[in-house]
Amino acid sequence: MAQGRPTTNTLTPADLSRQQMTFQTGVVLDAPPLLHQFGDVKTDAAARYTAGQTVSVVFVTGHPKNNLHRNDTFVKVQRLVDGAWKTVAVDGDWSTQYRWKRVFGAESEAQVSWAIPAGTPAGTYRIVHQGDARNLLGTITPFTGTSRSFEVN
């Protein structure tokens, strides 16, 4: 590197994942609140925002340990382009936040926030939450929730 040449590294770190201990319990059950389904919006987006404001949506969700969404995402911010939804941000972006909490017993909520960056093009947007819920028999089922569409000016 010091002489402008790449280094060659032949060492591969050992995979210790099977030897790691965890004291966290597994997920026993997820249940939506009465009269709700997984993916339902409990607190929706407003109709209009400007760059610099934060959109916040609360979804009925399952425990995130049901599926860690590696190589996937819990959150998508999408923009309507030529009649189709295009993803412009995911949960790995600095502008988004995904906050999960157990509300009561087996009920959970996910608060998804998007701090609209400066320079965001005007248009129609929405927030999508992807999650997974575990029933009493241990079956894990994916679901999707979508906010109302909103305008960014």
Residue ranges of each PLM-predicted region?
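Contiguous segments within soluble domain cores/interaction surfaces
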Residues: 48-112, 128-131
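A cross-taxa feature marking solvent-exposed loop/turn segments within ectodomains of secreted
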Residues: 68-70, 120-122, 143
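Generic detection of short hydrophobic beta-strand segments and adjacent strand-loop junctions
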Residues: 88, 112-114, 148-152
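Exposed beta-strand face motif in extracellular beta-rich ectodomains
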Residues: 123-127
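Short beta-strand elements
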Residues: 135-153
